[in-house]
């Protein structure tokens, strides 16, 4: 079983590391090509392209400039410990045991606009380059054209290595769009998280993102390998709703806290 999650905009390169083990990203040659393109952008162009403040644009221009092809624990940190958005609040990788990291390294992948696919222990230098950004490059008009089949092929390699054919899609639509489902050698299962609001169940972005992290942690902690085991997910009040689910979609609901 291979879990897919999105990266995060918020990064943490200060907190103490809970493991010293690391691996290197497998698609660094591609990342270097994107850095070459990104370095051509001025801070105002970055601000416009990414729809971010001038201050953030300056920070990210500096990140592109400072990026080096040689990754070390001094200039990079493990991706699963560097990302700090809502998904990662639910995942809480900073509390993983070494055995948890082992399982995650085999079964969890983070999709990335710059790095393509990251394993949890892959070193990552700080960046911001969301998958949906229209960064023109030698392969096309945006990052989807740049990555083409590369991400899908890398996921197929991971599936073949574990001898499995199930992908748990906990990534956002923006990121999963970089995967070619018809070329993926797997059944795709998509958990959906609905929270009650004023008597109706709907997707509430913040809660749904955190729930994707909670589900990832549930799979890793319990060493789950079969999709039917996911129905036991009950973290923070969620429960499986079989009536609302279908073959490819597992629906989990949570009542409003009153």
Swiss-Prot record:
Q: Which domain of life is it from?
A: Bacteria
Q: Which gene encodes it?
A: yaaA
- GO:BP terms for this protein? response to hydroperoxide
Please give the family membership noted in the entry: Belongs to the UPF0246 family.
NCBIfam families, A to Z:
PRK02101.1-1, PRK02101.1-3
UniProt xrefs under Pfam families = H2O2_YaaD
What is the name of this protein? Answer: UPF0246 protein YaaA
GO cellular component assignments: cytosol
InterPro entries in the cross-refs: YaaA
